[in-house]
Amino acid sequence: MKKVVVGLSGGVDSSVAAASLHHQGYDVIGLTLWLMKGKGQCCSEGMVDAAFICEQLGVPHHIVDTRELFEANIINYLVSGYESGVTPLPCSQCNRAVKFGPMLAYAKEELNCDRIATGHYARIRYDEQTRRYQLLRAIDRNKDQSYFLYDLSQDILKGTIFPLGEQTKEETRRIAAEFDLKTASKPESQDLCLIEAHGSMASFLDQYIKPKEGEIVDLDGKVLGTHQGIHHYTIGQRKGLGIAAPEPLYVVKLDAVMNRVIVGNRAAGGRSDCTVGRLNWVSIAEPSSPITVEVQVRYRSKAVPVSIIPIENNRVTLQFNEPQFGITPGQAAVFYDGEIVLGGGIILQDNDSVK
């Protein structure tokens, strides 16, 4: 019998992933990662529900304490990023460094199993021509999570199953009801677990970053108002600025050195190019010459045409066909060729040369 370790969060998606594989004849072992300390009690509820699902399926359940790993790779990453004026994307880093990598290692070392599965909406296939595993968008584009998975390695793709990649969320709910799973009617969780635990990103960050009053200025340096910390703002933000102006104003830059929030009209927030670093080419070999593909610069944004020009230090320059609004340092730029995730990286600040 084929053995698989299924990552269980206690939600309906991972529950159906486990139940479906169990129904297909896999020897399923449930595994839940204990991620958060303190206020993150959503983890406690999730662990209880995950244990219940495993009991319902008649399969073993393991809990792995990854709180220190989560704090080092995610909490510290978020806090330092927001303090420096970027808007970090924790999910892709969490998937690589806290979830998939450690899960697969635990499965191999402790459970003698070389396959893991999760409830993510994405697909994996093997390309015989290139002899590489490819990461693909999910069939359900509304639930597609491939944007958050671009940083996975070939070894992880080889050892991973995404049972939900070929179905819609509605089908997942229906299957959960058919299996009479406890989580069948459980509400949809937040995309970001920290927001679910703390109510908002601002509430979470306020525990780590002290208020620091600064100026909100326009592009000419005219002071329009004040703020209590640049970590409360992100590029493209319009609401919550607390300033009066004859036209809508948006955050176009965060200056951590001067502790300033710089605002302008929508046209001022458009960019025709940007630099992306910390690259991972998940489905193809690293290109040595310019390529023209599509890029997605936010989870919910539309993929748009882009020219990717390799430069030094594991970085590329992105040149957009049309100016793009809200290009945000710290977020991921993920490259697509149709449904195939080619790779991606982190949008850098103009003065950031970090590899």
Swiss-Prot record:
Keywords: ATP-binding, Cytoplasm, Disulfide bond, Nucleotide-binding, RNA-binding, Transferase, tRNA processing, tRNA-binding
SUPFAM superfamilies: Adenine nucleotide alpha hydrolases-like
Amino-acid positions noted as binding ATP in the UniProt annotation, renumbered to this chain: 7-14, 33, 119
Annotated positions for site Interaction with tRNA: 120, 331
InterPro entries per the UniProt record, alphabetical: MnmA-like, MnmA-like_C, MnmA-like_central, MnmA-like_central_sf, Rossmann-like_a/b/a_fold
GO cellular component: cytoplasm
Biological process, per Gene Ontology: tRNA wobble position uridine thiolation
Main location: cytoplasm
Domain of life: Bacteria
Annotated region (Interaction with tRNA), positions in chain: 143-145, 298-299
GO molecular function, one term: tRNA-uridine 2-sulfurtransferase activity
Subcellular location: Cytoplasm
Stored Gene3D superfamilies: Adenine nucleotide alpha hydrolases-like domains, HUPs, Translation factors
EC numbers for this chain: 2.8.1.13
Positions annotated as active site in the UniProt record: 94, 193
Enzymatic class: transferase
Disulfide bonds: 94-193
Catalysed reactions, semicolon-separated: S-sulfanyl-L-cysteinyl-[protein] + uridine(34) in tRNA + AH2 + ATP = 2-thiouridine(34) in tRNA + L-cysteinyl-[protein] + A + AMP + diphosphate + H(+)
Similarity remark: Belongs to the MnmA/TRMU family.
Purpose of the protein: Catalyzes the 2-thiolation of uridine at the wobble position (U34) of tRNA, leading to the formation of s(2)U34.
Protein name: tRNA-specific 2-thiouridylase MnmA
